[in-house]
């Protein structure tokens, strides 16, 4: 992927994505996770001869709104909904970071501004921000169509099952959000999930997620291999309950 760099954290296969604008600037998407890993990102940018000109947080969860002072004072964008929710729920949303980050890094987390439109403001090729409510309210995916690159946030993962938002009572909102990504996944040559590995077959990831959800909603057993991961057992059981609630609601 020319112009794209991806680092993977030791924690939960969390990805940090860097997009190079071709003019010496870099946009850092969802930098994570441990202090040494965060510090490595600006060092790597310096080694590439570029500087951070902007950040992007795909959604409000604590592992996607981190930052490092050496990245500088660049504007850090997210959806208006994410910015608004962090303004009123910052302490609750960021509380888990106390187990991982130093106080100065926690203070930097979640300092975001609302995107001025549906495209990322940068000097690179047009980058469309696709908003939906699967996984988290006002979640963003970023499609750089010229490059065929989809940065999908916590969607289209090879290691995580579909993970609805905490307040979802059925799978309906997740399915609707996933459908919002279909055209982007179909047009992209690469998808970069927030957890897991980038793929050159984005539609396979999309189809796997939709097949899993369809099976649960229809009351069929799913044979998705991600279910075999012990760390996914609790999430799978919760998804089965949401599917049952959806079926009972008609």
Task: Tell me what each language-model feature is.
Residues 90, 162-166, 203-205:
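Short, solvent-exposed loop/turn segments at secondary-structure boundaries
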Residues 1-48, 52, 66, 106-176, ...:
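Catalytic core of the metallo-beta-lactamase
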Residues 77-79, 152-153, 194:
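Generic beta-sheet signal
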């Amino acid at each position: 992927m020319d112009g794209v760099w991806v680092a993977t954290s030791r924690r939960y296969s969390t990805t940090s994505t860097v997009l190079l604008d071709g003019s010496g600037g870099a946009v850092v998407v969802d930098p994570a996770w441990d202090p040494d890993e965060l510090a490595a990102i600006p060092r790597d940018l310096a080694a590439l001869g570029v500087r951070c000109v902007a950040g992007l947080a795909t959604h409000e969860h604590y592992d996607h709104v981190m930052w490092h002072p050496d990245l500088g004072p660049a504007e850090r964008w997210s959806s208006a909904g994410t910015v608004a929710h962090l303004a009123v729920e910052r302490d609750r949303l960021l509380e888990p970071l106390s187990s991982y980050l130093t106080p100065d890094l926690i203070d930097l987390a979640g300092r975001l501004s609302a995107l001025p439109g549906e495209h990322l403001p940068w000097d690179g090729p047009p980058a469309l921000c696709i908003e939906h409510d699967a996984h988290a309210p006002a979640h963003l995916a970023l499609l750089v169509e010229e490059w065929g690159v989809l940065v999908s946030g916590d969607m289209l993962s090879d290691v995580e099952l579909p993970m609805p938002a905490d307040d979802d009572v059925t799978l309906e909102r997740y399915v609707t959000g996933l459908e919002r990504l279909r055209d982007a996944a179909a047009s992209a040559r690469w998808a970069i999930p927030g957890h897991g590995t980038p793929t050159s077959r984005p539609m396979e990831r999309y189809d796997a997620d939709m097949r899993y959800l369809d099976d649960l909603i229809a009351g069929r057993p799913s044979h998705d291999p991600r279910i075999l991961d012990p760390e996914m057992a609790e999430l799978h059981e919760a998804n089965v309950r949401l599917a049952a609630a959806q079926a009972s609601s008609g």
